[in-house]
C-alpha cells in the first residue's frame, strides 16, 4: 500500500524522524487556518500518489495565510497524471542549504535490503542513476545486523554527504531504518533530505510503501487506506480477492497464474506495436484454483473499465480447468447483458480444453472469438482494440 506524503510524515513523527510541522486539509479555508496556526511561511502540497507534483503546479510556497488560501483553491481539483487532488498538506517552509536523497527498499533481484543515498537530492533518482551514477551509493543491508549509527554514517559517507552533516544524517538514516523494519515497509524514501543553513537535517518529503502481506500484524495500517483515492475497479476486484492492477492500455487481460499473465502482457504489448500502439489495460490473475464465479467476477471488473476496447482471456487449464473458465465466461456475459459490449478473444489450452471450447462454441455469443495460440489471440485482441 502506497501512502500519501502526509501519512508518511505521520510515521516519521512516530519514529522520531525530523521533519517540518504541518497538517492535512481538504479545503482552502483549512489551508489558510493551518498557515495562520504555524505563523510562518508554508508549503501547500497536493496529496496524490504519483510524482511530478511540482511541475504540474501542485506544490506552492505561501508567504501568508491568504497566499495559502489562494494556492489551495488552485490546487484542489487539479488533475496530476490522472490523480485528482482532494487533499493538501500545509507544512512549515524550511530554509534549504543542500538537498540529499536517502531510501531503503527491498532488492528482490539479490534477495536483500538495499540502502540508496546521494548528495544529489531534489531530483528524480532515476535521472541521477542515469546521468551521475557515481553520485548514487547502493549499499546492501544485512537483515540480521540492520543499520546502527555506524552503518548509517557509512551509508551517508558513500552517498558523498558533507563531513559536517554526517553525524546528524546518520541519526536520521538510523531512524528511517527503524521505521522501515517496524512498519513492515517495502520502501521508505526521502527526497529531499535537506541540510538547513544551521546544519539541521530534515525530511521534507516522504514516500512510504507498506507490505500488505504484513497487515495481520499491523492492524494500525488499516487507517491509512483511502478508499476514495483507490481506483473503483481495484476496489471491486479486491472484494472478490482478485489479483488486479489497472494499467493505461486498451486490451483487458485475464489469465491464470502470475507468470502466464506477465507473459500475456508482453505478447499483447508486442502485438500492439503493429496495431496503433495499443497496450495492456490491466494485470488480472484469477489464480490456480479459480471457479466459474471468479472468472465471471474478473470479466465484470474488466468490462466496466472504460479504457478497455477488447479483452484477451488466456488460460492454460491445470487446477483451473478450461470448462470452468468457459462456464465463467458464459455466466459473466449472461449476467452483464447489454453492459457486455466489448469483444472477447479467448485462448484455452490444457485440462479439459475440448470441453471448454465446445461450451463457448455452443453458447455462440457474438462477442466471443476463440484463438488457437497465445500469439494469434494477442494479435486479434490488439487489432480489435485499435478499431
From Swiss-Prot:
PROSITE patterns: ATP_GRASP, SUCCINYL_COA_LIG_3. ATP binds at residues 45, 52-54, 94, 99. Succinyl-CoA synthetase functions in the citric acid cycle (TCA), coupling the hydrolysis of succinyl-CoA to the synthesis of either ATP or GTP and thus represents the only step of substrate-level phosphorylation in the TCA. The beta subunit provides nucleotide specificity of the enzyme and binds the substrate succinate, while the binding sites for coenzyme A and phosphate are found in the alpha subunit. The keyword Hydrolase does not apply. This is Succinate--CoA ligase [ADP-forming] subunit beta. It comes from Mycobacterium avium (strain 104). Its cofactor is Mg(2+). Residues 9-236 form the ATP-grasp domain. The lineage of its organism: Bacteria, Bacillati, Actinomycetota, Actinomycetes, Mycobacteriales. Belongs to the succinate/malate CoA ligase beta subunit family. Keywords: ATP-binding, Ligase, Magnesium, Metal-binding, Nucleotide-binding, Tricarboxylic acid cycle. It catalyses: succinate + ATP + CoA = succinyl-CoA + ADP + phosphate; GTP + succinate + CoA = succinyl-CoA + GDP + phosphate. Heterotetramer of two alpha and two beta subunits.
